[in-house]
Amino acid sequence: MLFLPTVKSFSAWRTSAVTFCVALCASLFGSVSNASAAEKSLVLKGGEGPGRGKHIVFVTGEEFYRSEEGMSMFARLLARRHGFDCTVLFATDPESGVINPNQGKHIPGLEALKSADVMVLFARFRELPDGDMKHIADHVNAGKPVLGVRNATHAFKYPPDSTSPYRNWDYRSRDWQGGFGQQILGDTWVAHYGRFQKEATLAHRESAHRSHPVLRGVAETIFCHTDVNSVLRLTEADEVLFRGQVLSGLNPTDAPVNDARKDVRMPFAWFRTYTAPSGVQGRSFTTTAGASLDWLNEDLRRLFVNAVFSLSGLEGAIGDKTDVTFVGGYQPKPTGMLSDAAWAKLMLTPSHFAEGAR
């Protein structure tokens, strides 16, 4: 006998089928919003190499220089080529979970710093919740190594009426002069010395520290697309390895500017022994380079990786020419600020950078 389903039975069957399909898809793929929100960081386990057992945590969050690209590239390189465990943290939209460095108050996953051997900071004007900021402060107060990239000299910014216990980390602080940048890295934000996006940098090796282990395999000069930053407050105790000269254009063949800045070379890369608010001393390395295009320069990458070795207590493992070949490709984007709508359209999450930009 032919069975003809009733409207009621067909409706029940359809509801069950749809429910099953939704549940199956969710179990296999997860919803886009939930998957993005749950994905806090890029975590890469190191392979064999001198960095095995060491944990490097990258804290990114700046609007101009594509730190999410450059620092992820270094994490892949350090993990695959040299054995370091690496975690990369990103500024994200708290609702969608997508990467958006315009979100100045949200960098999830900072608890990863509890196990960090080195913190790499590439952030600008952040005002993080006190609970999150505490992880950064704890790292510094323990005297652990810090590697600051370009905007890290002005990583934090608080409103004048802030009651946060970390308000003095502001780059304009007068109570803790110059805040985190000046006290931990050696200087706070001063100004662009070269013209932004119009005058590139040619960095020259400093003769006083020519034999420094971190300079092994690094050329005498390094070209960067980013302009020279003013750095005015370093002390004689700070070790300047490179100084930056302003070029008249954005190409490595461009001549130096022909004005009063022609013979001025600002600190470009240096080591410092800092004293934390706790009174404990630690070590930092800073470079005013940092745009994603800058890292196409092999010698700059080698300087960065060698500095990580040094800060990790592995200076003796720095070879004659540290391997800094890319892992998974590297196609950096130009410098420039993007709108919230543009970041939402890109829909980038940490896993996007697991093996190179798509």
Label each PLM-derived region with a short phrase.
Residues 121, 126-217:
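A glycine-rich, often tryptophan-bearing local segment used as a flexible ligand/cofactor-contacting loop or short
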Residues 32-37:
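Sec/Tat signal peptide C-region and signal peptidase I cleavage site
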Residues 54, 68-72, 106-107, 114, ...:
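A structural signal for well-ordered alpha-helical segments within the folded catalytic domains
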Residues 1-14:
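N-terminal secretory signal peptides that target proteins for export/translocation
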Residues 16-31:
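Bacterial N-terminal signal peptides
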Residues 40-42, 79, 85, 103-105, ...:
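Catalytic beta-strand/loop cores that center a nucleophilic Ser/Cys/Thr
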Residues 44-48, 57-59, 63-156:
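Helical hinge/lid and interdomain linker segments adjacent to catalytic or ligand-binding clefts
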Residues 38-54, 69-70, 77-84, 248-358:
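Extracellular ligand-binding/catalytic regions of CAZymes and related secreted enzymes
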